[in-house]
Amino acid sequence: MTATIEAAPPQSLTDHFLHSFDLAHGMVLQLAEDFDDASARLAPAPHKPLVWFLGHLTCSTDYFSTLHQGTESLVTEEFSRRYAGNDNQDWSIGPSLEEMIDLYKAVHARMREFVAGLTPSDLDKESPLEPFGDDRLKNLGKALAIIQMHDAYHCGQVGCLRVALGKHVPF
């Protein structure tokens, strides 16, 4: 007997992008659930702490918004300098875990609203601003794909951090 696989109902491109964008975001939040302020700042070598991941992902999504939505940044220059790159810092200082999660959610919500209004023809648009360091971010469709992959990539690293800290990975 041969099994028949039915095709899924067609999905709009916008729904596809929103699903992918929300999936990685939700996974990061799920991985952060059982951290507290102290454990969110711990990271055995060679890992980065959870607060860095949250700040880094916030910076990248915020940067996308400034490039393609023309919005003002939701993060300060100091915040961006601290979390956008890979430098090691004194992670014992900085916003609380709750503040970091709230900012990550706010940046996601702002971009989600923008993505929900996109049409397929919008994906070919170019940012009027010059991207810093990565020309692939100039095109809206490419930048959107990169930001989704970026969150998913770091989600895997947060999973590795959890294992290094003796925590269970929930998925």
What residue spans do the PLM features occupy?
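Short, contiguous alpha-helical
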Residues: 2-4, 14, 18-22, 29, ...
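Hydrophobic alpha-helical core bundles mediating ligand binding, dimerization, or RNAP-core interactions
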Residues: 17, 21, 25-28, 32, ...
